[in-house]
Amino acid sequence: MPLFGSIFSPKKTPPRKSASLSNLHSLDRSTRELELGLDYGTPTMNLAGQSLKFENGQWVADSVISGGVDRRETQRLRKRNQQLEEENNLLRLKVDILLDMLSETTAESHLKDKELDELKVTNRRRK
């Protein structure tokens, strides 16, 4: 056991060799272009028998969807769905307004009934 040395000092690791694992750096430009290509095209994938490609930031069906609905039909259905959601939101707003109106009218009716009962009681006391 050393008196003035640290027993926890690790041994130094030997430096790594700087050999590259790929031989792409040794190829000339034309060979690299042939091997790797510069035009990658749009990314495509197959998922559950459906071919999809990435266009304009969205995955769209490359051809006909497995259910027999094409891309235009899907877009039309999405647009219709959006319209129906907007209509549904408008109808919910109208129902909320009608419920507020009903509760206000009911409260006014109860107040008038109370006033009428008080007037009847005061009228009976006068007689």
Swiss-Prot record:
Which residues lie within the region annotated Minimal region for the interaction with PKD2? Answer: 60-112
Q: Where in the cell is it found?
A: Nucleus speckle; Cytoplasm, Cytoskeleton, Cilium basal body; Cytoplasm, Cytoskeleton, Microtubule organizing center, Centrosome, Centriole; Golgi apparatus
What GO annotations for molecular function exist for this entry?
beta-catenin binding; protein homodimerization activity
Keyword annotations for this protein, in alphabetical order, are:
Cell projection, Cilium, Cilium biogenesis/degradation, Coiled coil, Cytoplasm, Cytoskeleton, Differentiation, Flagellum, Golgi apparatus, Nucleus, Phosphoprotein
The superkingdom listed in its UniProt entry is Eukaryota
This molecule's function is given as:
Inhibits the Wnt/Wingless pathway by binding to CTNNB1/beta-catenin and inhibiting beta-catenin-mediated transcriptional activation through competition with TCF/LEF transcription factors. Has also been shown to play a role in regulating the intracellular trafficking of polycystin-2/PKD2 and possibly of other intracellular proteins. Promotes adipocyte and cardiomyocyte differentiation.
What is the protein name for this chain? Protein chibby homolog 1
